[in-house]
């Protein structure tokens, strides 16, 4: 009897943990199918200012500037350097002097010390507060597609659009990242069609200049891009991801580097959702409250629920034989989840196990991020993925 109670407890916690993923995936598919989110054909008439945060990017800064200069929409450029210890700034200055016609104007802001990317973005927002039009933030390791700035400009001819994010074409050999990115992108597109997504990609993110203030961002947390997207929506306009606005970047080349990146990102998203908990059930936010609430469920409650289910399952299997049909079925499901997780963990996902394994690994990263946060450690000051920079420089 006790074993059966453990089984019921495990089943209840597993349902709590997995239900939001199934519900939100179904909802997002429906929202995409029924959505009418389309990029306008007309230009907005607004100027564009590119915001480029950098730190020790000497290997790739010239390639990044060249990529931006090839855009068919001439823009202003603001580089904010987080106290680089290499020659990022000097290379930038030399390149800009060699190609003076590449941008309408340029400015390099030098921070006295490195405080993390979010602090850098906050300082840059204050510095360009006098500018009108559109701010386009992009990362040094991202290559944006031809015509990206023109497409961004067209989006803002819709007065309801406050922020637009690009969709990654992530290159690399880690199959788990490909599966994760597919799920993540479809979720963001579904949320965008329904109302807004709280999570956009900082590798290519645009917003109306007057929609975000530095005070909207919490400096001692990462996920500055998601903070901006959420702030835009809470300030009254939509934040959407465009599936045809594409940028290319490289995933970390090792599983360890990938997990480090995922845990850092997970902590930033969890902290963002917790800070905005008053909006989870806000009638004023309407549909966006539903999106925030479900993401909070998936990012905060689900990892804890699945961990609890795993503990109960372990206790049951160590203590009791499968005495009932329920216990036998749960043992099979446990084996499936364990195998799925292990296959994705070692970068060997196979059909039928890929989605489940991707979700399990995502829950693992969220749990680790929760534990790290609970210990009082912030990951907003992160170590650079030097393998990615080296690979990009050799292309």
Region locations from a protein language model:
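Short, acidic, metal-binding catalytic loop of nucleotide-sugar glycosyltransferases
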Residues: 66-75
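Basic/Trp-rich segment in TM-proximal cytosolic loops or flexible interdomain/linker regions
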Residues: 2-3, 31, 255-257, 261-330, ...
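N-terminal membrane-anchoring/stem segments of glycan-assembly enzymes
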Residues: 1-42, 365
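Conserved donor nucleotide-binding strand/loop of the catalytic core
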Residues: 78, 89-127, 167, 175, ...
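Catalytic donor/gating beta->alpha subdomain of glycosyltransferases that bind UDP-sugars
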Residues: 156-184, 220-224, 228-292, 361-372
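Short beta-strand-to-loop acidic/aromatic patch adjacent to the donor-nucleotide binding site
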Residues: 131-143
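Long helical/loop segments within the catalytic core of UDP-sugar-dependent glycosyltransferases
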Residues: 118-120, 124-126, 132-133, 146-220, ...
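A conserved acidic beta->alpha catalytic loop
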Residues: 67, 81-91, 113-115, 142-143
């Amino acid at each position: 009897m006790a074993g059966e109670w453990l089984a019921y407890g495990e089943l209840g916690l597993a349902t709590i943990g997995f239900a939001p993923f199934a519900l939100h995936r179904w909802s997002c598919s429906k929202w995409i199918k029924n959505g009418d989110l389309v990029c306008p054909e007309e230009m907005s008439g607004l100027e564009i200012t590119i915001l480029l945060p950098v730190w020790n990017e000497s290997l790739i800064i010239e390639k990044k500037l060249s990529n931006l200069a090839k855009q068919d929409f001439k823009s202003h450029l603001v580089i904010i350097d987080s106290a680089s210890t290499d020659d990022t700034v000097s290379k930038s200055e030399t390149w800009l002097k060699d190609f003076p016609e590449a941008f309408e104007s340029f400015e390099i802001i030098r921070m006295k010390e490195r405080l993390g990317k979010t602090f850098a973005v906050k300082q840059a927002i204050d510095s360009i507060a006098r500018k009108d039009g559109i701010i386009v933030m992009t990362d040094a390791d991202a290559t944006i597609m031809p015509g990206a700035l023109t497409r961004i400009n067209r989006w803002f001819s819709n007065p309801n659009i406050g922020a637009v994010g690009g969709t990654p074409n992530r290159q690399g050999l880690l199959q788990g990242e490909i599966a994760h990115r597919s799920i993540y992108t479809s979720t963001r597109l579904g949320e965008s069609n329904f109302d807004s997504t709280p999570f956009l990609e900082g590798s290519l993110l645009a917003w109306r200049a007057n929609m975000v203030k530095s005070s909207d961002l919490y400096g001692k947390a990462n996920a500055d891009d998601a903070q901006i997207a959420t702030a835009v929506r809470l300030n009254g306009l939509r934040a959407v991801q465009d599936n045809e606005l594409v940028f290319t970047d490289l995933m970390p080349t090792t599983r360890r580097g990938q997990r480090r990146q995922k845990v850092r990102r997970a902590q930033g998203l969890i902290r963002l959702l917790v800070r905005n908990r008053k909006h989870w059930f806000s009638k004023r936010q309407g549909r966006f409250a539903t999106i925030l609430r479900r993401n909070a469920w998936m990012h905060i409650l689900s990892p804890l629920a699945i961990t609890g289910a795993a503990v109960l399952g372990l206790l049951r299997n160590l203590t009791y034989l499968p005495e009932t049909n329920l216990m036998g079925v749960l043992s099979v499901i446990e084996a499936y989840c364990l195998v799925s997780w292990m296959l994705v963990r070692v970068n060997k996902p196979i059909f039928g196990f890929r989605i489940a394994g991707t979700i399990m690994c995502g829950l693992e990263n969220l749990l680790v991020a929760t534990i790290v946060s609970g210990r009082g450690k912030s990951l907003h000051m992160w170590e650079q993925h030097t393998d990615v920079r080296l690979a990009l420089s050799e292309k």
